[in-house]
Amino acid sequence: VLVLMGALAWWMRAPWPRTALEWLHIGVSGVLVHGVYLGGVFIAIGHGLPAGVTAIVVGLQPVLTALGAGLLLGERVRPTQWAGLALGFVGVAMVVAHKVAASASGGMLLTMLLPALVALLAITAGTLYQKRFCHSFDLRTGSVIQLLPCLVVTGLAAYQFETLHVQWTGSFVFAMGWLVLVLSLGAVSLL
């Protein structure tokens, strides 16, 4: 994603932030939103927390962000917005309720849940941080700036905690293609 977004930014001559402070703020928001959030989600699932339970935990992000926006940014959340957030959360809960029940009956451990909670706090903090300190930036160059420190952070974490051995199976290649092309580039293009 980093290479593709960098090439796109260069090819389209996208504007880059002018000050080191802008780069720093965009980088910090990127580490929180991309590195810590996604890392926490994948670690939680890797430790055995079902994807549905992980989804319900990080599905609280809009609610926490709305609370934080009111408390930290002085934004007012209207009652209709709270109702929409509540309906969305209820919808997610209904879809994954059976998985939550199965995990709880199987003895859900804090070690499984903790990375998902860290991911929730990271995506919330990153969203609020970006709203507060990254007022406007080009999505092409901003994505590059957000992903550069993530490469360093996740690279160091992988070096420390992983085997660095990749099994190049068809399933792995398809999953990586989906994560890179559809989820990452697709999500950025929707912004």
Model-derived features with residue positions:
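Hydrophobic transmembrane alpha-helices of multi-pass small-molecule transport proteins
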Residues: L2-M5, G68, V77-K99, L120-I123, ...
